[in-house]
Amino acid sequence: MARRCELTGTGVLTGNNVSHAQNKSRRRFLPNLCDVTLASEKLGRGFKLRVAAKALRSVDHVGGLDVYLLKARDEKLSDKALKIKRDLKKAMAA
């Protein structure tokens, strides 16, 4: 399973641990991923997604999963999130 947020596309970054003596050793910065079920008001059901904690705060800030997906750019969303977004647009059009 990839270490990537399904809503923001946040993934693993690499860098250095730097000691007081300026010795450098390679390290990885992992995203804070959470397995959560987010509810869609328009579709009337929940969706299991693997998202970063920052993305959860963003979803709360804008007012829910539906609003977040409609505002999000398609390049950042996973295939699963894109399918939810398409279903959401169909439900709103009907």
UniProtKB/Swiss-Prot annotation:
Pfam families: Ribosomal_L28. Disulfide bonds: none annotated. GO terms for molecular function: structural constituent of ribosome. Keywords: Ribonucleoprotein, Ribosomal protein. GO terms for biological process: translation. The keyword Ribonucleoprotein applies. SUPFAM superfamilies: L28p-like. This is Large ribosomal subunit protein bL28. It comes from Maricaulis maris (strain MCS10).
